[in-house]
Amino acid sequence: MASGLTRLLLRGPRCLLATAGLTLIPPVRGVKKGFRAAFRFQKELERWRLLRCPPPPVRRSEKPNWDYHAEIQAFGPRLQETFSLDLLKTAFVNSCYIKSEEAKRQKLGIEKEAVLLNLKDNQELSEQGTSFSQTCLTQFFEDAFPDLPTEGVKSLVDYLTGEEVVCHVARNLAVEQLTLSADFPVPPAVLRQTFFAVIGALLHSSGPERTSLFIRDFLITQMTGKELFEIWKIINPMGLLVQELKKRNISVPESRLTRQSGSTTALPVYFVGLYCDKKLIAEGPGETVLVAEEEAARVALRKLYGFTENRQPWDYSRPKEPVRAEKTIAAS
């Protein structure tokens, strides 16, 4: 310690003044680094908490800046369609909403005459929209794929009018936000009924031709990238192929193993070809010979039905003929 004091005295008064000057520097003003780190940690913790336990969904009508009448009026122009305002309002009213509102009024002790709401539900519009949509889609598929049997057409129509596809389209068109339902989020069955009620309202407002274009633009487009037998489930493709070939007076197909690879490994692959009159009509791969034969039968059926992967895409630019629309409304 004495040696350190001696060095300090030998350096002179400048060193003493320098050290004294360092102690006189005022502290830095501002947010400390420790506080910033704690604030960032708190924000990150809150974000993870919201991801882990998200808050329950809230109706759009319960949030600020909401005008239901203005939203109803803007629904048609946003889709470039013309709706009757009264029909469109009716299309969004479900029977479960009417029952729940009447039950709430009864709990408040309101008189029976005042309990009843002067509203009409969308049941009738939904039935008309469903019937027209199924008929219109059936005609679309029959015109586009004339060789496709009735069972295949029905499977495609059922797929496009099912809850999964219809609810996906309805949510992207903001139908869910305008739907008057007792529960939220809106149940899929109620949302599907509401969407077809909107189609029924469009049918009465703009006619069958505009409604068929609406169905083409929003439902047929959901077939993009879809494979036929992902939608139409076939248990015995070879048996169906034999029936189709008999209708066309073609001999029964014969299956032959054309190629194989890795047959002694864990991931083998086989290629089976189907021959009719010594001509190769289809070839399909599979992990076993039986699976490859079934895949070859599916490939042959796609060729017969005109539903191949390299088929011509759907024409959305050409307007539909009014005669077809008249046939659709007459059939529905």
From Swiss-Prot:
Residues 1-30 form a transit peptide. Residues 86-228 form the RNase III domain. Residues 236-306 form the DRBM domain. It is found in: Mitochondrion. Keywords: Endonuclease, Hydrolase, Mitochondrion, Nuclease, Ribonucleoprotein, Ribosomal protein, RNA-binding, Transit peptide. Disulfide bonds: none annotated. Its main location: mitochondrion. GO terms for molecular function: double-stranded RNA binding; ribonuclease III activity. One of its GO terms (cellular component) is mitochondrial inner membrane. Component of the 39S subunit of mitochondrial ribosome. May have a function in the assembly/stability of nascent mitochondrial polypeptides exiting the ribosome. Component of the mitochondrial ribosome large subunit (39S) which comprises a 16S rRNA and about 50 distinct proteins. Belongs to the ribonuclease III family. Mitochondrion-specific ribosomal protein mL44 subfamily. PANTHER family: LARGE RIBOSOMAL SUBUNIT PROTEIN ML44, RIBONUCLEASE III. This is Large ribosomal subunit protein mL44. It comes from Bos taurus (Bovine).
